[in-house]
Amino acid sequence: MTARDRNRRWAVRGAVHRAVAVATTFPLVAHLGDRIAIGREPAATVPFFNLWSLPWTAQRLPHLLHGWWDAPIFWPARGTYANSELQPLTGLAFALLRPLIGPVAAYGVILLLALVANGAVT
């Protein structure tokens, strides 16, 4: 197999994964800046918590994550953020995207990118 064939195969796989990500989250792409995907859950607890935790992580990044474990959502308890689903790399991506497209759209783009990346490595 030549390098050109491998590149073509990766391009096709990438297109398929992008299409599947868009299809499984439809109509997210049409409402990227004003809606969040909640899937088939009856309550949006996880997406809303993620939409809170990503800005928290982004806020702590300039401080080298100092105080990250003491998230104000769990106040007055200290260190309890460690019991959550920590997403430092996702928080970094959110910190870069949020100023450009807003928090809700950044969350949607990160969700789509995560689905595409998940498909690419399986």
Give short role names for the model-derived ranges.
Residues V121-T122:
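Transmembrane alpha-helical segments of multipass membrane enzymes and assembly factors
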Residues M1-A30:
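Start-transfer (signal-anchor) and selected internal transmembrane alpha helices
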Residues V22-N118:
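Membrane-interface coil-to-helix junctions
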